[in-house]
């Protein structure tokens, strides 16, 4: 066979995968910093001791202790909980279970979390965007106009990267608009920082509501890769058909169960209180910093701010080993950087570096 007729391995791949721009995670973007404030992680490590040593056996598909502990914590039934490799896997499972590639669409409202788009594109499902309003709330009319053929609507509340909660009345309206037509996924990755805003209590009324949760943020376990999907039992049973047979390793399940014990949850809540206190310190300091044009309200463990010269500020801090998250490419976020709330020492380094910037 001539070399002219030989396909490269890349040519054998699906066209949408060849054209795919992968999600630019904080770790993928790299950097050589010692102050990492770009991934909304908790700034200090937590310690656990493994209690399960049966690594010669496959783990449970849905570890009973993890499911029961999370159900009790979230105020739902165990049958309404699915555990997965981070909330990102939950995003993918919902799309795989409900969307026909080449036929159905997902819908989301930028600026928002990038994995909704990447997961849909990977699977070959159409992506529709309805940009958020100027105040970053939902454009309900725009969503209504684009619902035909959309099987899944993603809403992040509090929203990443903007930090604000979505108006609960708008969420109710969205759930009524989509009843019998589409699944609504409420991404609550940051809900521990504003627990009063959870939609978990709405599952009784809305059979098409799905809620995503994670241990990566307030539980300080980003390295564990453990997330949860809350939904009615009918939805959970569908997702169980498409999830991998052993999504959680034994060590992950072991640590997750410990983190979700009453003691673990109390420690998490103390951590949240500490983070909220540091967030206010950082907000106050940013508001008194010359190169900062505006600091947006936040209900999370990060702050979005608009700068007079964000690109040069980002690079200057990067060169000093302070790694922030550039949001300039997100719709309506020109001039914006996202700053994870760190320790007091890290937050002070950010402020000192910003105040040294030319205006």
From Swiss-Prot:
Keywords: Amino-acid biosynthesis, Aminotransferase, Histidine biosynthesis, Pyridoxal phosphate, Transferase. Its cofactor is pyridoxal 5'-phosphate. It comes from the Bacteria. It catalyses: L-histidinol phosphate + 2-oxoglutarate = 3-(imidazol-4-yl)-2-oxopropyl phosphate + L-glutamate. One of its GO terms (molecular function) is pyridoxal phosphate binding. The modification N6-(pyridoxal phosphate)lysine is found at residue 217. InterPro entries: Aminotrans_II_pyridoxalP_BS, Aminotransferase_I/II_large, HisP_aminotrans, PyrdxlP-dep_Trfase, PyrdxlP-dep_Trfase_major, PyrdxlP-dep_Trfase_small. GO terms for biological process: L-histidine biosynthetic process. The keyword Nucleus does not apply. Signal peptide: none annotated. HAMAP family: HisC_aminotrans_2 (MF_01023). Homodimer. This is Histidinol-phosphate aminotransferase. It comes from Salmonella typhi.
